[in-house]
Design a protein with these regions (language model features):
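Membrane-proximal basic amphipathic "stem/tether" segments
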Residues: 1-48
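Active-site and donor-binding regions of nucleotide-sugar-utilizing enzymes
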Residues: 49-133
């Protein structure tokens, strides 16, 4: 093995040692979501009349957030508000879309989707009964 080959191999190993963890982290789903959220947070403006609701990580539409939603949706002075509910799966989204199809100002997003991250950065009001990510 020549000196040049030996030095090249050592340099390659050291660079891999330094950069592989960074490359792995950048490819992770979690890092991708954090970066997307940060991009939306920087780019998007807060919408004055938008409310995001999340109950039990999107598993249901119940509890205090639902009571608040029902109260707001029935009052004429809150008609201009857009209500966005977080759901956990596509099937849940379809179920609630059908249930609330007559409400033009009610939408649903799947938890941790791009639409969810966008709504999280744009909504002036965040209503939940647990914690947001």
């Amino acid at each position: 093995m020549t000196l040049k080959t030996c030095l090249t191999n050592q340099l390659r190993r050291k660079l891999n040692f330094l950069f592989k963890p960074i490359q792995r982290k950048n490819k992770s789903a979690y890092t991708s979501k954090v970066m997307t959220y940060a991009k939306y947070y920087k780019k998007n403006n807060v919408k004055e009349y938008q409310i995001l609701y999340q109950v039990r990580d999107g598993k249901s539409i119940t509890d205090s957030p639902y009571a608040i939603f029902k109260s707001l949706i029935q009052q004429p002075r809150y008609r201009k508000y857009k209500h966005i509910w977080v759901v956990d799966h596509h099937e849940t989204l379809l179920f609630y879309k059908a249930r609330f199809k007559y409400y033009k100002n009610v939408e649903f997003v799947i938890k941790e989707s791009r639409e969810y991250l966008k709504a999280l950065t744009e909504s002036k009001y965040l209503i939940n009964n647990s914690t947001f990510p």
